[in-house]
């Protein structure tokens, strides 16, 4: 017998599958072959049936300095307050010329709505691009009027001439019989100190993004969306080595382990892996024209399950929630948003923490090496960095459903190998890095396992970089990069799979830069770039798009390969981009 109020698929999922047909393609059908403009394989956010209400945040703004770009927000009229879906759309462009990649952020009431970086222009190409983010889980924030800002610092002068332009809007899809209102968090709370919003600078491992909050007293689930972006000396953290090796291999120090650590009242509460984003000016700008690296234009937050702490957080006392970046070495920018589901039938949820094996496991990697330096000063060998932690965090909450026991069981691992070949004429460094998360969140009522959420996440990175002299007194720098993102999720009830999905996003890029004897760039050759994005789920949804380019021009684009009828099709309520969802939302609690 099931606990009172539960069904096998939950009223939300049952209603959706009973009422909806499969949505259409996620990208436009027009071919990009021959284009030099930004071209990506990523899916856009699938939409429910119906006409959305549109709220413009800003339109046609020019970003030429570091001044504020504030905007006022009010919920749309005529769409109700319980929406089927909310989508952020933003469009950016940069005038042709010279300009660095820049960080772009959109905020509302202290909460981050979008985070990414810009495409670098060239002397002949004025790139433009479109980004989207599913903000349905932030509906509680969007039901209230507020103030926001676009943060996009830029420098325009006689040298750096590229002017960045941007517009952004929110699309609200009203709930209907065919598109029921989404089950969303009841509270959406930022951790930053800026009431309008801005990222927090974390200079070292001890620098916190933190906030002390007195929270609602009826929390039954809690999550934290985390973004940690490398900047300045940390931009190329994935190529750095421990300080003791830096001089020998002529690389940045500080090591290459980075990981976001979440704590509650100083107690470890979870881990958010850091993605090795490479910006469009990174390593060799030609690598990323016209296709940037994985998520470069649109970062994806990682969602940390804090539900075992729900009972503790509901006790009416102030609690400090914090994020630190282990290994930060001047510096990271961080954003974090707390998402709380509240019991609609109780004013007070009581409970506590039962077990936390993450406490006492410091994020300290093991370092090894096979480096050898001969009598001529030639260096060869590798430096390895490894850390793997398995932990279990368990807690309980007395809710209107009864006592709910929640457990997060997770293994987070990091491996990095930096291989070097250095002699009088050659410098070669090969980076092989893999960050992985294998976890399961379980929720029980008595003997009944009412929700189970599995995640298998991988961030592979390979960078092969070499610098060699040429016969004419110049130099060549050859680079090959592979970036990947894969995520497999599965939701179960009573041992049966309710939903499963697989997301894969890979980018492979290569180029060779030519330098004269004074290290001025004189040209490049051999530029190639390819991206493949794939999604499949247990409902029959399928998305696959591949793009390839040579010398900055799109040479091939294919959609729907391997999908039924050769077409991309997904249900509107799924997340083909791999963006986070709350693990047990499909069960209706």
Labelled PLM ranges:
Residues 203, 207-209, 232-240:
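A short secondary-structure junction signal
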Residues 12-24:
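Bacterial N-terminal signal peptides
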Residues 2-14:
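Bacterial N-terminal signal peptides that target proteins for export
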Residues 182-206, 213, 346-414:
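Compositionally biased low-complexity segments at domain edges in trafficked proteins
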Residues 205, 216, 254:
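Short, contiguous, pocket-lining structural segments
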Residues 78-87, 215-223, 234:
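Extended extracellular/luminal ectodomain segments enriched in beta-structured repeat modules
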Residues 29-70, 74-80, 91-187, 197, ...:
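Beta-strand-rich ligand-recognition modules
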